Amino acid sequence: MTLTFASPPQDKAELESGPAFTPRFDEKGLITAVVTDARDGELLMVAHMNAEALSLTLETGFAHYYSRSRDRLWKKGESSGNLQTVREIRTDCDQDAVWLKVSVAGHDATCHTGRRSCFYRTVGVADGEAKVAITDDHRHFDPAQIYAGN
């Protein structure tokens, strides 16, 4: 069974305080998903979901996302074994973003680079230019081995 979502109410108070989950997908049919570790709160990734991905996530308890670059649905961790079990989903005040608190199986890594989080670099300024510096270079798995042939 695939869940369907009602259109968001016109009444702002109903949208912000009513009991119905009525996600506000953007013009491309997507909603932003912020993903953190349910255990320690670390920010793991930011992704997008279409209605099908959100529905599958709610129905199965496993995180599904929509890849804009590949133009397809994907179950997070299906290739790597690092499945995300959803412990809680929250939505923001105007229901145009969701927050998933997850437990990560396998190597406890979320990023395709093998790192725990996709946010492994800091941004700063050096010599008048914006630069990035790697602050977490620990890889929980070797992407070349995990994704060979993909």
From Swiss-Prot:
InterPro entries: PRA-CH (IPR026660), PRib_AMP_CycHydrolase_dom (IPR002496), PRib_AMP_CycHydrolase_sf (IPR038019)
Keywords noted in UniProt: Amino-acid biosynthesis, Cytoplasm, Histidine biosynthesis, Hydrolase, Magnesium, Metal-binding, Zinc
GN (gene name): hisI
Binding site for Mg(2+): D92, D94, D96
Pathway: Amino-acid biosynthesis; L-histidine biosynthesis; L-histidine from 5-phospho-alpha-D-ribose 1-diphosphate: step 3/9
Cofactor note text: Binds 1 Mg(2+) ion per subunit.
Residues binding Zn(2+): C93, C111, C118
Enzymatic reactions: 1-(5-phospho-beta-D-ribosyl)-5'-AMP + H2O = 1-(5-phospho-beta-D-ribosyl)-5-[(5-phospho-beta-D-ribosylamino)methylideneamino]imidazole-4-carboxamide
EC number: 3.5.4.19
GO MF term (any one): magnesium ion binding
Gene Ontology CC: cytoplasm
Family the UniProt entry places it in: Belongs to the PRA-CH family.
Pfam families referenced in this protein's UniProt entry, alphabetically: PRA-CH
SUPFAM superfamilies hit by this protein: HisI-like
Necessary cofactors: Mg(2+); Zn(2+)
Compartments where located: Cytoplasm
Protein name: Phosphoribosyl-AMP cyclohydrolase
A biological process term (GO) from this entry: L-histidine biosynthetic process
Function text: Catalyzes the hydrolysis of the adenine ring of phosphoribosyl-AMP.
Self-association and partners: Homodimer.
